[in-house]
Amino acid sequence: MSEKSIGAPAVRIRPLPLRGVLKIGKAADIWHKAALSAPIAFGVPALVLLALGRLDLALYTSAGSLCAIYAHGEPYASRARFMAVMILGMLAGVGIALVTAASTDSAAIRVAVAALLAAAHKTLCDAARTGPPGGLILTFVAASCLFVPHERLADVPFHLALGLAGGAVAWLVTMAPGLVRPDGPERTAVARALEAASRLAGAEPDGAARARHDTAAAINAAWHTLLRAGARTPARAANRRRLERLLVHAGTVVAGTPDDPGRLAGWAADLRRDRPVPRPPARPGEDGELAGIAADRAAAAPRGVRGLLRALRPGSPLLPVAARVATGAALAGWASMALGVGRPYWAVVTAAAVFQANITLSWRRGLQRAVGNLAGLALFTVLLPTTRAGGLALVAAVMALQFCTEATMARNYWLGSVFVTPMALLMVELAALQPAGRLAAERWLDTCVGVAAGLLSCALVTNRRATGRIGAALARLDAATAAARALGGGAPDPAEAARARDRLASALVDVRDAVDVASGEWWQGALPAERVERAERDGHRALAALAPGRGPASRAA
């Protein structure tokens, strides 16, 4: 492809893949945290309500308790604020849903509100970078509450108070590990970066490019974690400083400095096992590098409302995704109604679950959702006689399914859906029992309708801004490369060199991520492949020229 074809209007349709859709991957390194937190946060208020004879109210407490699956990678200093905002956001959606349910019997209006809430949840969670499961849990709870039978306006404050109580339990559960391991999230984030650097140091030439990208992304994520971590005591401050030194050392591997993979992996193991933080060999000017990188990243990363508004500015790639979610969720709900489903919340949730960064990922997620839901409905049918034997059995089943969901979701979405489907159906049963056969049939119909509507919306609402995002990322990469080259001719100040390396590595990650997203759009103009390849090559060369220990002669070469 010539450079002239970059701006050509021609488009081509990319095939949607089937290979590897159902492949089982590795478990997440901290899967057990959410897998234990979720059932505990649900079980405590549910068992209290069971003892009081009001298990029917557990649907409302579960709205807050489900927030316990979030924020397990956040440092505790920021986790407290993050969880409070997430719980309030959950309750805001529940409040809108309950008021709507109490104010109108029109299923069409309820579906429209559910679709708008789904779009808002998806957009805000992506903008805030909450991480998995993003806005989907908020959408599930709000959509379920929209179809709660016999809701009255007078009961809404009490039901929201129950949700707040469940949220308080979730907050305590997610903060409790900080009493034992207060720097656990920071250690885990840096360990991931060191493990990635170890793989890069031992990578074969044909796998070095992907390993370099993965390492740079892990380092980037670890820096974000450290910048949100508190250091209120001298001991915590000293530990954080050592963690920062390890990150700087991992960054030199990305820049091309050879290292021992075994040593890097050993340092990562020490961090995970709560041993003293390793101390890499000191280098001249390292303190200046640390100060430069920390100051540069702190200035470049807007937080709170300012960061949220920046992510949602006009031209944001999140806006087409929001339009897709609103359109697909509404189509799914209304189609389900037309097919005779009385409470089509599951179709709305399914459509919302399908939407990913591009249509290729959405296609994969749709197939995984369909397969997982079908198997999950079979499991629900098997469990039904047990769960209807009594309230205690119902609560125990939900807790067990929550554990299995969080233990398997990271391995493959379809596998997690096998457990999340019966869990979600049983949680709705807390409010009122429904005929089992009809419930299973409607949920399977809703699944098919939701997947179809979601994929149709992806095809109709195109994300043409994906290619524009590549152009913006390339412009940042070109600027970072030029700045790095300007420092490469002599003996730059270590702090300046470290800042330039860090900016350049982050810019390379952004370009590759933008290309991956745009490449997954099936109806897309020609991508600037030659320009991307040239910019990445120049960026990697400039990054290598700034590797610590290289003199002017080696840089010039």
Model region roles, listed by residue range:
Residues M1-G43, E151, D155-L160, A170-G342, ...:
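Cytosolic regulatory and coupling regions of membrane transport/channel systems
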Residues A10-G20, A35-A46, L50, R54-Y76, ...:
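Pore- and pathway-forming membrane helices of multi-pass small-molecule/ion transporters and channels
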Residues L22-A34, L52-G53, P75-V85, S103-S106, ...:
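Short, amphipathic, aromatic/basic-enriched membrane-interface segments that mark the entry/exit
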Residues I69-L88, G93-T100, T104-I109, T233-L246, ...:
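Hydrophobic alpha-helical segments that drive targeting, anchoring, or assembly
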Residues A298-L401:
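Conserved mid-sequence domains
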Residues V348-T350, R365-Q368, L439, R469-A473, ...:
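Composition- and surface-driven signal marking solvent-exposed, interaction-prone regions
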Residues I359, A375, L379, L383, ...:
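Hydrophobic alpha-helix feature that most strongly marks membrane-spanning transmembrane helices
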